[in-house]
Amino acid sequence: MNYIPYVIEKTGRGERSYDIYSRLLKDRIIMLSGEINDGVASSIVSQMLFLEAEDPEKDIYLYINSPGGVITSGMSIYDTMNYVKPDICTICIGQAASMGAFLLSCGTKGKRFSLPNSRIMIHQPLGGAQGQATDIEIQAKEILRLKSILNGILASNTGQPLEKIAKDTDRDFFMSAQESKEYGLIDNVLEKSFK
């Protein structure tokens, strides 16, 4: 069971209680924690759209601590990151693996960060298929199509050649924060808050 802390904010009109995520949203901070699925993606997308409507000129800060998750859910977040006008600052806290690492790399260039002891992992898409041979063939073609799309975006985000991305994502490829900076997934390793 997840415990969600509440914070008290004092104003000129008294006190107001917020759950911590609502309070962070006031500061344009979105937390992407845990597995990426349709529910998590809907929440992240909704928050980005809300923050764009509030102020399309101010950056949005997306903190990521995720083992990855469903490709289509992650792609809805990715598409929204590109769709909204504000720059998206991505910050890895803990880990960004699989789709989490992909989204970390998709922040606005120059605004992709990691804390020093985070780990980042990229790999090829995971999938499974069952049913008739033709159904399995259809699923295999689709996962190869998604692999090609993801590798192309990672190559663009990192500046690495597509062939290197394909080789490195063939199996789990773990990096430290510093190694992910050298690879091009992030732009800087943060020791202190930059806000």
From Swiss-Prot:
The keyword Protein transport does not apply. GO terms for molecular function: ATP-dependent peptidase activity; ATPase binding; serine-type endopeptidase activity. HAMAP family: ClpP. This is ATP-dependent Clp protease proteolytic subunit. Keywords: Cytoplasm, Hydrolase, Protease, Serine protease. Belongs to the peptidase S14 family. One of its GO terms (cellular component) is endopeptidase Clp complex. Fourteen ClpP subunits assemble into 2 heptameric rings which stack back to back to give a disk-like structure with a central cavity, resembling the structure of eukaryotic proteasomes. The active site is at S98, H123. Its EC number is 3.4.21.92. PANTHER family: ATP-DEPENDENT CLP PROTEASE PROTEOLYTIC SUBUNIT (PTHR10381:SF70). It catalyses: Hydrolysis of proteins to small peptides in the presence of ATP and magnesium. alpha-casein is the usual test substrate. In the absence of ATP, only oligopeptides shorter than five residues are hydrolyzed (such as succinyl-Leu-Tyr-|-NHMec, and Leu-Tyr-Leu-|-Tyr-Trp, in which cleavage of the -Tyr-|-Leu- and -Tyr-|-Trp bonds also occurs). The keyword Hydrolase applies. The lineage of its organism: Bacteria, Pseudomonadati, Campylobacterota, Epsilonproteobacteria, Campylobacterales. It is found in: Cytoplasm.
